Amino acid sequence: GVDVTFIDAWPDNVQAMRTQGITVTGMKGAGSVHTPVRALHISDVSQLVREHPFDIVFIAVKSYDTRWATQLIAPFAAPTGCFVSLQNGINEEAIASVVGWARVLGCSVSALAAELTAPGTIVRNSPLGDEKKWGLRIGEAHGQITPRAETIARLLSHSDSCKVTTNLWGERWTKLTMNARGNGLSACTGMGSKALIESATCRRLSIRLAGEA
């Protein structure tokens, strides 16, 4: 197995994970999954000083929280530990400003859609990917395929198909374009992705937004 620790700022979510674990539903072709996990609130991280340092840190916060989240966890990472931006947007530079570029990788969530619907409960809205449609793409900033990138890809493949990419920045801009065509439109209309696709008017707007991006 793999020793995983979740660290979150939402007290209700931390408490639910501690007492009930995590439940992932709606996984087409894979059923539902429930598993106990270790969860810490951000106010509890000081206790990590007595433990083995982290070998891999996944930064999975909103872009505006990237820098402080990295600063918070950096003291508890191994000297050779790496930091993976598992986020939308381009946040690798913010992470590198804290720990240095040599320790930073990026992971684009290409074809995996999910939402946290309640504390400790995640609904997945996309099927598992495969070699024709990768769910995740991880890469180094310099574009080389490295042993650590391959190791992390194998770990992430427990959640979805994962490919090591030599074009991280291309993956990032592709995802940004995808988000630009739909996220703002969804916020303005209150419609989900499926409803936007089904609306002829929204489809036209989405195409024009993608063209602008």
Regions of interest found by a model, annotated:
Residues 3, 82, 103:
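Residues at the starts of beta-strands that form the adenosine-phosphate
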Residues 52, 86-175, 181:
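Rossmann-fold dinucleotide-binding core
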Residues 3, 9-55:
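Conserved N-terminal Rossmann-fold NAD(P) cofactor-binding segment
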Residues 20-22, 71-75, 97-101, 118-123, ...:
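Short, glycine/charged-enriched secondary-structure capping and boundary segments
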Residues 47-98:
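Rossmann-fold NAD(P) dinucleotide-binding segment
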Residues 169-197, 201-213:
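Active-site-proximal catalytic alpha-helix in oxidoreductases
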Residues 12, 16, 151, 155, ...:
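A non-catalytic, amphipathic alpha-helix used as a structural packing/dimerization or gating element
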